[in-house]
UniProtKB/Swiss-Prot annotation:
Transmembrane domains' residue ranges: none
Cell compartment(s), UniProt: Cytoplasm, Cytoskeleton
GO MF terms held by the record: GTP binding; hydrolase activity
Protein family per UniProt: Belongs to the tubulin family.
Keyword Calcium: no
Cystine crosslinks: none
EC number assigned by the record: 3.6.5.-
Name of the protein in question: Tubulin alpha-4 chain
């Protein structure tokens, strides 16, 4: 199980934080009690992350 802690300061921070958590729950299928249904793994589970483009295309910074 993964854990995530977020700290929001002030009224605007709390409102933005609530909106973000609502979006995260909708996108990832998280229920109101914080649990993810076992049969609704979205995006391949914990092992899959999008880290941008793969490979070296000769980009230099």
């Amino acid at each position: 199980m993964r854990e995530c802690i977020s700290i929001h300061i002030g009224q605007a921070g709390i409102q933005v934080g609530n909106a973000c958590w609502e979006l995260y729950c909708l996108e990832h299928g998280i229920q109101a009690d914080g649990q993810m249904p076992g049969d609704k793994t979205i995006g391949g589970g914990d092992a899959e992350f999008d880290e941008g483009e793969d490979g070296d295309e000769g980009d230099e910074y």
